[in-house]
């Protein structure tokens, strides 16, 4: 069992060594991530993990994926994408440049979902899409756009709920063991490493998706990240959070509810 003191000491050592601040992440989630990491590498003590994390940069870069479990899939929560298609994106039908940020994009399934929706609305070629994540390994997979073929049947169910007559072959090139996102989608996404907790964001966006990311944060860290997202949104822009995310009271002072069911919030025009 990992004690609070051991966890705090390890997180502080990581912060001092790599500049990554996990001190306000949800403690139970971090402890479970550490247990997964130790089991995966057959480590018997936290001291053994501590030494490896602080001495081996490549090991730590890969360990981030075990510390932070990514929740993502193609067309996850179809009603969100239907709301985007039938309401939110209609407001940008005549704009020349639509800017969208996927904050915490994980392995890219949600990014490519948005690209498919944008194409359907005739907006893909007028949209600048930025997708960021803390994990370099997740970003590499997202850039490649390669997913195990067996996942396609799983992803087909929510896709059909969104668009009943869709075929995966319209969006992916299939090979024996995997499917690859068609280049017309990959070419319109810029993937970058970004830490929501410590890194600034100088660009401005009409839509930001930060879904199932804040579940790992305590209230203090949620407020800090929401400040960043608020500043990055243009007035009248939309923030979309995940079904497992809970908007804290502080966030409710920044954003107004657009659609509670789909967790869509709006930055007031006068902000």
Task: Label each region the model flagged.
Residues 235-243:
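Conserved beta-strand signature within the Rossmann-like core of class I S-adenosyl-L-methionine
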Residues 1-101:
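Conserved AdoMet
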Residues 107-122:
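Conserved SAM-binding loop of SAM-dependent methyltransferases across substrates and taxa
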Residues 223-235:
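A short glycine-rich, Lys/Arg-flanked "PGG" loop and its adjoining helix->strand segment in the class I
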């Amino acid at each position: 069992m990992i004690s609070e003191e051991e966890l705090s000491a390890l997180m502080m050592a990581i912060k001092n060594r790599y500049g990554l601040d996990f001190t306000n992440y949800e403690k139970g989630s971090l402890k479970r991530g550490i247990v997964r990491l130790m089991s995966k590498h057959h480590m018997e003590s936290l001291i053994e993990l501590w030494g490896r994390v602080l001495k081996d940069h490549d090991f730590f870069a890969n360990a981030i994926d075990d510390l932070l479990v990514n929740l993502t899939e193609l067309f996850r929560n179809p009603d969100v994408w239907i709301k985007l298609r039938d309401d939110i994106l209609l407001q940008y039908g005549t704009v020349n440049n639509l800017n969208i940020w996927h904050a915490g994009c994980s392995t890219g399934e949600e990014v490519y979902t948005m690209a498919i929706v944008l194409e359907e609305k005739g907006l893909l070629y007028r949209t600048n899409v930025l997708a960021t994540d803390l994990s370099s390994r997740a970003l590499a997979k997202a850039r490649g756009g390669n997913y195990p073929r067996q996942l396609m049947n799983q992803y087909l169910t929510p896709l059909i709920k969104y668009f009943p007559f869709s075929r995966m072959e319209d969006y992916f090139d299939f090979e024996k063991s995997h499917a690859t996102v068609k280049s017309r989608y990959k070419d319109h996404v810029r993937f970058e490493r970004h830490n929501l907790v410590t890194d600034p964001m100088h660009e401005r966006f009409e839509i930001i998706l930060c879904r199932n990311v804040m579940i790992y944060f305590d209230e203090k860290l949620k407020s800090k990240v929401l400040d960043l997202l608020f500043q990055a949104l243009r007035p009248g822009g939309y923030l979309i959070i995940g079904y497992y995310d809970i908007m804290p009271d502080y966030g409710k002072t920044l954003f107004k509810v657009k659609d509670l069911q789909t967790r869509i919030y709006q930055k007031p025009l006068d902000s």
